[in-house]
Amino acid sequence: MMTIFFNKTDLSRNDAEKIISETLNNCDDGELYLENSKSESILLDDGKIKNSTYSSDLGYGLRAVTGEVVAYSHSNEISKSSLKQSADNLSSTLKSKKGVYNHKIPKRNEQFYKNINPIEEKSLQSKLELLKEVNNYTRAKSGIVHQVTASFSGEHKSIEIIRSGGEVLTDVRPLIRFNVSVMLEKNGKKETGVYGIGGRQSYDEYL
């Protein structure tokens, strides 16, 4: 279980589980989907920082299914009043529908990647230094290098799914990307080559 969704709000885990169970009582399926997403990007163009961004988003989605009817509500505010409002909206949509909640879902507890946060494991300065090294190395290879653009992007998502009855499923999803674009110019002719690598891994693969 994760604490990040409940440590800065008036909504407790017990409150959330109670609201979910009451809302999904007469439904066939449904869940509360909580997500905390952080992302960053750094772009170096000809040795200068052209762009550097960071964002952090927190929110939830509440879904209920009865027969062929699917009701959904979402919000960027995780609070008791917000979740209660979403639950009321779903109950209103499904008020004439009755179903039996399916507690038996297939589970595959396989770890496909490490539980890491690539954004926080390395400093911004260390990432910039590597991008500068790429720029200097590439330009030293040939005098016809006209432009070098190198970038890092990283993402980290924490996800928790709470189903009726208090069943909890969690996942942490890291993601990084490293790109290099090089433009060569000779006798008035320009050509560009691009290469990129990445995946659900750590910046340690490159830094």
Where are these regions (language model features)?
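Acidic low-complexity segments
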Residues: M2-S21, N25-S41, S81-D171, S202-L207
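Broad gene-expression machinery/nucleic-acid interaction feature
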Residues: D29, S39-S41, D57-G61, V65, ...
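N-terminal alpha-helical targeting/anchoring segments
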Residues: E40-K95
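Short beta-strand elements
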Residues: T53-T66, L169-G198
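A short small-residue
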Residues: V69-A71, E110-I116, V194-R200
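Short, solvent-exposed aromatic-acidic interface loops
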Residues: N76-I78, Y195-D204
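Generic structural motif
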Residues: S37, G67-V69, I78, E155-K157, ...
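Detector for glycine-centered tight turns/loop "hinges" at secondary-structure junctions
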Residues: G47, G165-G166, N187-G188
